[in-house]
Amino acid sequence: MRKIILTGDRPTGRLHVGHYVGSLRERVELQNSGAFDDIYIMIADAQALTDNADNPEKVRRNVREVALDYLAVGIDPAKSCIFIQSMVPELTELTMYYMNLVTVSRLQRNPTVKAEIQQKNFEASIPAGFLCYPVSQASDITAFKATHVPTGEDQEPMLEQTREIVRKFNDIYGEVLVEPDIVLSTNKACLRLPGTDGKAKMSKSIGNCIYLADSPKDIETKIMSMFTDPTHLRRDDPGHVEGNPVFTYLDAFSTDEHFAAFCPEYSCLQEMKDHYTRGGLGDVKVKRFLNNVMQETLRPIRERREYWEAHLEDVQDILKAGCEKAENTAAKTLSEVRRAMRINYFEDGNLLK
């Protein structure tokens, strides 16, 4: 079986470091590994409209921002197909067919959907499109017969819902669709990076993010104001590293080379953690080290973004070519689905016979 990746992001804002360690960094590594036959990376504008229907300009504007972020982190259009969801109409048709294979109660039980409904205050009035977006995700994944989906752990319920739809479709109509596997980062700190305010999740809407496109000054300001251990009031106080966002970020980003370059009194992160835990290490010093780490990590990303911002016509050409390739692939899958469902009425000329 061909090994195929499908992944993507909603264009509701610029991408942040949570996206980077949660999936973007992994995507670049997978892209460059040569282990996959095809890689599709989707800008999910149609999905973004499920809770931004009254603000389409926001979605339109951020299609550009997400495309620039993809290219900035190292997504290579020669190796990965970057496309816009709404420019592949076959996905909408597949969604309609799949909606007959899932119940409303099952959609309401999806933990990811339940959490997002609460976060967006949709309890009293849930847009139908928002409730059904797991079905749309199933269409996105199966249209390209994706075998692997790199994403965050909070999306596992979505992948399981896709697998359920695939199994039900194949059971009724025959073996057409492929069940996908999730690809998670091996670094546990990367699975869900907390916000700079200590909240469990970094969120564009809450504003507790460090963006990939942030200036050096903005990065420094956000890091130096980060939440830490509230019981660590003085430098000599014993501190806690568990649940401390500064150390969670260091888990996700720092390397021994960073210590050699910026904090040579420690050979590795564990030595710094041990010192902080027993007392004698202040938060300011730890934050300054984290700032050096983040500046070095984000500098090349920001420089590549500036290059592509100066070549927007090339970015548009990349997106157009990606959409054409994605539509051709999705059309083939849709044809197989119609044939399996016996709704390919004029394909063989036997409709009325």
Label for each model-derived stretch:
Residues 2-139, 257, 296-298, 305-306:
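N-terminal Rossmann-like or analogous alpha/beta NTP/dinucleotide-binding catalytic cores
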Residues 1-2, 328:
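N-terminal amphipathic alpha-helix/helix-capping segment at the start of soluble metabolic enzymes
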Residues 157, 163-353:
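Conserved nucleotide- and phosphate/pyrophosphate-binding catalytic cores
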Residues 7-9, 84, 145, 195, ...:
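Pocket-edge structural micro-motifs
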Residues 83, 149, 351:
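Residue-level "edge-of-site" marker
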